[in-house]
């Protein structure tokens, strides 16, 4: 297991995704719970400060500052607490998150500004929204200084104030602004946004939550996969929604 690279600035872009690119937020109740646990995990006495964040359907982007050891403790608390909640609520078992979270050190103001924009533009690039004004990110906190937004207030000066912040975010940044390829976290543009795919899947399954498909008896699981394919979902979308491996989905759909 490789040793994490420390940042002189103490700031890191942290990314965590569902195991097998599985959906980790089924609805807004899940998202609210995650943000509650997130704020508790990065409380004042944790030694870790949350700067920016964004929740996608199958992964999370966080920009945080602190010592690596403190970050590891906070991330372990966040991931384990949320996974226990999610598994209980959705009657599933097994790992929710894929291995260790990824972290990229941030060293310069230019890199910091680019990463903040990258995090806030994730929903826009993925087709979840038509701008950065997305309810499950810190974009609004920067503008309104919500939730004791001292870090956001100070960082607005990096953009020349609120108007500069809006202008900087109004244009989609190129790949050079990204610390990790979009494709690695499934955040690229898709023909059917994940939120739409989730609704289609629920309708096709007739009351079975997509995340529960992987734990169904094999015959019922296979039939569910077939219904999802017939509903127009791609192999990759079915993999993410159900947690069933891509190879199994492809085999069942005859791809």
Locate predicted features:
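Short Pro-Cys-Gly-centered "Cys-loop" motif that presents a nucleophilic cysteine in a tight turn
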Residues: 1-52, 65-255
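Short Gly/Ser/Thr- and Asp/Glu-enriched loop/turn motifs at secondary-structure junctions
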Residues: 55-59
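Short beta-strand motif characteristic of blades in beta-propeller domains
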Residues: 60-64
């Amino acid at each position: 297991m490789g040793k994490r690279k420390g940042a002189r600035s103490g700031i890191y872009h942290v990314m965590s995704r569902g195991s097998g690119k599985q959906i980790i937020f089924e609805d807004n109740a899940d998202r609210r719970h995650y943000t509650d646990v997130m704020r508790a995990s990065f409380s004042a006495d944790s030694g870790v400060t949350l700067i920016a964040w964004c929740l996608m359907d199958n992964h999370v982007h966080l920009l945080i500052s602190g010592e690596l050891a403190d970050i590891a403790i906070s991330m372990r608390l966040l991931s384990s607490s949320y996974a226990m909640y999610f598994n209980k609520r959705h009657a599933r078992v097994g790992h929710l998150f894929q291995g260790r979270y990824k972290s990229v050190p941030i060293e310069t103001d230019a890199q910091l500004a680019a990463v903040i924009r990258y995090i806030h533009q994730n929903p826009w690039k993925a087709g979840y929204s038509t701008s950065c004004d997305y309810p499950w990110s810190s974009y609004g906190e920067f503008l309104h200084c919500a939730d004791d937004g001292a870090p956001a207030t100070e960082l607005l000066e990096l953009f020349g104030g609120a108007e500069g912040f809006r202008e900087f975010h109004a244009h989609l940044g190129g790949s050079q602004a990204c610390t990790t390829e979009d494709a690695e976290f499934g955040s690229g543009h898709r023909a059917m946004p994940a939120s739409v795919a989730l609704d289609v899947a629920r309708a096709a399954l007739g009351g079975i939550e997509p995340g529960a498909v992987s734990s169904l008896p094999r015959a019922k699981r296979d039939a569910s996969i077939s219904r999802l394919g017939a509903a127009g979902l791609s192999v990759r979308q079915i993999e993410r929604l159900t947690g069933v491996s891509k190879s199994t989905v492809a085999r069942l759909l005859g791809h």
